[in-house]
UniProtKB/Swiss-Prot annotation:
Function: Serine protease that preferentially cleaves peptide bonds on the C-terminal side of aspartate and glutamate with a 10-fold higher reactivity for a glutamyl bond than an aspartyl bond.
Cellular component terms (Gene Ontology): extracellular region
UniProt GO molecular function: serine-type endopeptidase activity
Keyword Cell inner membrane belongs to the record: no
Swiss-Prot/TrEMBL keywords: Disulfide bond, Hydrolase, Protease, Secreted, Serine protease, Signal, Zymogen
Principal location class: secreted
Disulfide bond positions: C184-C204, C307-C333
Documented EC number(s): 3.4.21.-
Protein species of origin: Streptomyces fradiae (Streptomyces roseoflavus)
UniProt protein name: Serine protease 1
GO-annotated biological processes: proteolysis
Top EC class for this record: hydrolase
Propeptide: 30-170
Subcellular location(s) per record: Secreted
Amino acid sequence: MRRTTRARTGLSALLLAASLGLGAAPAGADAPQRPAPTPASDSAAALHALDAAVERTLGDDSAGTYVDAGTGELVVTVTTEAAAAKVRAAGATPRRVQRGAAELDAAMAALEARAKIPGTSWGLDPRTNRIAVEADSSVSARDLARLRKVAASLDGAVSVTRVPGVFQREVAGGDAIYGGGSRCSAAFNVTKNGVRYFLTAGHCTNLSSTWSSTSGGTSIGVREGTSFPTNDYGIVRYTTTTNVDGRVNLYNGGYQDIASAADAVVGQAIKKSGSTTKVTSGTVSAVNVTVNYSDGPVYGMVRTTACSAGGDSGGAHFAGSVALGIHSGSSGCTGTNGSAIHQPVREALSAYGVNVY
């Protein structure tokens, strides 16, 4: 488990086409009607509600949850029959596994203490009941051998995989939100006491106190908070008087309404919206992920198989109408096989006391 009828102008219209990855109708136009919730949206919301209920019931009695690829059911890993009975009572499917939360947490702590190597990433994969470690192409043969030695000492609780590319934050020059001479994307519009903001990646908000919709253009927002490394989120307050919408741009003429926020579940299908690769799809492959970027580690991230590229940093990860995360980085994309990593959005919402809408 993890450690949450006035015409309106959309964010992408405000920032011009293809800027933030969020949006609705152009300024002065009638806002299109909000779509009714789709079955996919309802399914995602129901999944997260069940996952949250199981987490409240079991706490550390579970070694993680995931979505079964064949049945679509929520599977909860447990080590005792008593815990399995609680899972059944909650309406989910239990699966008995060898390692509990304490042993997996200890393996994570050992990696942090003994194998904190730039270019590595690790997180919980409850499908295998292991900590899944990835080492990118920048990790030397000597460091890889050291990593494998540490993994071998942990009684099978850790798997190590070499992956192509290099784990990096995905900032680029080009077309989207601009600050400090760099380009990023934005995740979700949020609100607090009637004031509108947008969330983006902390490594983006570290770069500049003001943000615009075009390179060198007029400022549309000012930084109100930033957190990177350790976390990877930041918040920008709108300085424009335009009323901005809270939907995500699907880059096909359509938009996804966002109604709630939740933590991602391993195995669930997600989408990523960013200003470079637009909308890409994938599944969640690990949670509670540590990524050792070259300029500092981030903790509690989520690893997915969605594709991403430079300039997508700060974009939205979502499932139906549920906001999941803020795009952080990846080790690249081969064909349709990606490694997009996100900062869980609920942590950012809590840190700044804001809500999606």
